């Protein structure tokens, strides 16, 4: 909750990836706030006020996930809206002739994004969402200490450079929020 607020102000890509993880945590507890309260939140060193805030925040997200049909997969509207915002900014950067570094990073990452999208479950996601999914997937692999192949590493490197290109425009992205 506190991390999400901070990331939302500082780095929208990191915010989206964090929220993907939070959604997965909530799913792992079957969107049951009682289980989250008893098993997950005690892991943190919250004082009573912070614990109550965290409980309300997770409860709100769990309810949103249920109401919006994201109990098993997908993302809540607040996360999707942030992705749309990033996608809009992405299109603006691609159209800006002064953003040659961003454009170069994009065209280097594009073949990997297209390949990843082709390997998807048949649902054609926008390029930016595919890139975010790839970054989240590699994060999960690393958290689980699973090996990452050379091809995957090359793809993630190119996609990460695209994110770095976006971070260089952080001031303008933050102004959009």
Identify the role of each PLM range:
Residues 12-19, 33, 54, 58, ...:
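Short runs of predominantly hydrophobic/aromatic residues within well-ordered alpha helices
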Residues 25-28, 46, 60-71, 85-96, ...:
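Amphipathic alpha-helical interaction surfaces
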Residues 76-135:
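A charged, amphipathic interaction segment
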Residues 2-73:
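N-terminal interaction modules that seed assembly of large macromolecular complexes
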Residues 114-172:
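Glycine-rich, aromatic-bearing surface loops/beta-hairpins
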Residues 3, 45, 53, 62-66, ...:
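A structural motif
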